[in-house]
Design a protein with these regions (language model features):
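Short hydrophobic alpha-helical segments enriched in small aliphatic residues
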Residues: 25, 41, 47, 53-56
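ATPase nucleotide-binding head domains, primarily ABC-like/P-loop NTPase cores
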Residues: 279-496
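Conserved amphipathic alpha-helical "coupling/scaffold" segments
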Residues: 57-221, 255, 262-265
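Extended, charged coiled-coil "arm/hinge" scaffolds of SMC/Rad50-like chromosome-maintenance ATPases
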Residues: 220-244
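Charged, surface-exposed helical/loop "interaction arms" that form contiguous linear patches used
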Residues: 237-281
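Short, often N-terminal, low-complexity regions
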Residues: 12, 21, 26-37, 42
Length: 496
């Protein structure tokens, strides 16, 4: 897959004079190196976009392919059927922009093994530094940077005049500028201290953070503030405020933005580490270029006191999961897929350990709706969805494909024959892994001796006239037949 590059424009009023805008284009190159292209446009644009800024973080990495149906099935950002969204697990960041970056991470899984490992190693690092400022201070800096006022060149006479004027009246505008400048000076000093304290054996992501701080601060005029006003109690002069306001919001606006982005990334890593520690998640699942896929001690992250299970793709490229209704087949499929999804985000997974291929795509067919508008039945929706995901497999992508209860919208004989036909087709796509749940035991037994298939079942049984469902995943094919018992048990009160 070719690298996906998000090219961006940072549009910012220069305020050097009223003759135009400075437009900076950033493009990500290699290891976070940035190319800044400077363009100028006419006064006409300045009239329409005074002090306007649009900031988008550039990216140069490859992403795992998926679709809206899969994200809905896994409840990535929105829960269905009263399920919690997966994002809510990791939404407890210290900053608002950290929350936005976490959302970006969890909705955009990677298929770049080095980028995934880089995130994992940083999250697992026990000596992650604290954020240099608290949430309120960082929010104030964001507000200050976007504050819509005239940025002026530093001038001693103007500074003295404005200082005298402010003795006579309270100036809210000046307070915003003064506090914003003071906080950025404090921020730059603390970031420089963080850089100096970065250990030689620190993870690559933290070393890159330290190098970015070094290049940004000491490779520009920002180095002037290092050593100045480290304490909040000391206040810079009015001329100094004007000087650095011009430096921060005009000349090096984009550099300050870049440093803030690094802080939010640190916030994301700290939050993910906190989740891993509190929930016992695995920070570093082993990502591999082979098709080995196995998980030990996995659970669905939102099941209360859920039983942990072990699973692996032990045979071929197809795993058929059987079991009675209510045994937990769909939840198990979701738990496995969520673990694979989070592993590709570089985030901790709800398991003790995991070996996971780096997939090109993840696709599911779990909660398919009917369509009254299109006149499409549930059965037809299933057929079209299976066709859609198999086209992805046919394209040569290495995919994880989840099919939950294929062809439940038709009669048992049709469902059996259709499932067998689909399974024969799946065997051709050796570069993909397929997890299929079914309650049609005849379908599973049809492939019992096929080397392309492995088999697991969710245990359930009737014991002392009670339905026992331990949610235990076991190798083999289920023999449980409890449907009639459940119907009889629930309806027996209707008999007179």
């Amino acid at each position: 897959m070719k690298p996906v590059k998000h090219w961006l424009l940072l549009v910012r009023s220069s305020n050097l004079n009223k003759t135009g805008l400075d437009i900076y284009a950033k493009a990500a190159l290699g290891n976070q190196e940035l190319l800044f292209l400077f363009l100028s446009v006419s006064l006409v644009l300045h009239d329409y976009f005074p002090t306007f800024a649009l900031y988008v973080i550039p990216k140069n990495m490859t992403y795992l392919d998926t679709d809206k149906q899969t994200q809905a099935d896994l409840s990535i950002t929105e829960g269905i059927y009263d399920e919690y969204p997966l994002y809510s697990l990791f939404s407890g960041t210290e900053t608002k922009n950290g929350k936005r970056m976490m959302l970006d991470w969890i909705t955009s899984p990677l298929n770049d093994i080095s980028a995934i490992r880089k995130r994992q190693e940083a999250i697992a690092w026990k000596e992650l530094p604290e954020l240099p400022l608290d949430e309120e201070e960082l929010d104030f800096i964001e507000y200050y940077l976007e504050y819509r006022d005239q940025i002026r060149r530093p001038n001693i006479l103007v500074s003295l005049t404005s200082a005298f004027d402010r003795l006579l009246r309270h100036d809210a505008q000046r307070y915003i500028i003064r506090r914003g400048v003071t906080l950025i000076i404090l921020l730059l000093n603390r970031l420089d201290t963080l850089r100096k304290n970065t250990l030689e054996n620190a993870p690559l992501l933290l070393k890159e953070l330290a190098q970015s701080i070094q290049d940004t601060i000491h490779g520009s005029e920002l180095k002037e503030v290092i050593g100045l006003y480290k304490d909040k109690e000391k206040s810079p002069s009015n001329y100094t405020i004007d000087k650095y306001d011009y430096l921060f919001r005009c000349i090096h606006f984009e550099l300050i933005r870049g440093l803030l982005s690094q802080i939010y990334m640190l916030d994301v890593c700290r939050t993910a580490q906190h989740v891993a520690i509190n929930r016992g998640f695995c920070c570093c699942p082993e990502m591999t270029d082979t098709m080995d896929l196995s998980i030990t001690g996995f659970v669905h992250p939102f099941t209360k006191e859920g039983r942990s299970n072990d699973w692996k793709m032990s045979n071929g490229n197809i795993c058929i999961l059987t079991g009675s209704n209510m045994a937990g087949k769909s939840t198990t499929l979701k738990a496995i897929t969520i673990a694979v999804w989070l592993a590709h985000c570089g985030l901790p997974v709800p398991a003790r350990s995991m070996i996971c291929p780096v997939f090109d795509g993840i696709y599911t067919s779990i909660n398919l709706p009917d369509s009254l508008r299109d006149g499409r039945s549930h059965f037809m929706a299933e057929i079209l969805r299976i066709k859609e995901v198999l086209q992805k497999a046919k394209s040569g992508k290495r995919c994880l494909i989840i099919l939950d209860e294929m062809f439940r919208g038709t009669n048992a004989q049709d469902a059996l024959e259709a499932s067998v036909a689909v399974n024969e087709l799946l065997k051709k796509y050796l570069h993909c892994s397929f997890l299929i749940s079914t309650h049609i035991l005849e379908y599973a037994k049809h492939f019992e001796k096929d080397s392309a298939c492995s088999f697991y079942y969710m245990d359930s049984r009737i014991q002392n006239d009670q339905f026992i469902c331990p949610y235990q995943l076991i190798e083999g094919i289920s023999e449980a037949q409890v449907g009639y018992w459940l119907v009889r048990k629930e309806l027996e009160s209707l008999h007179y």
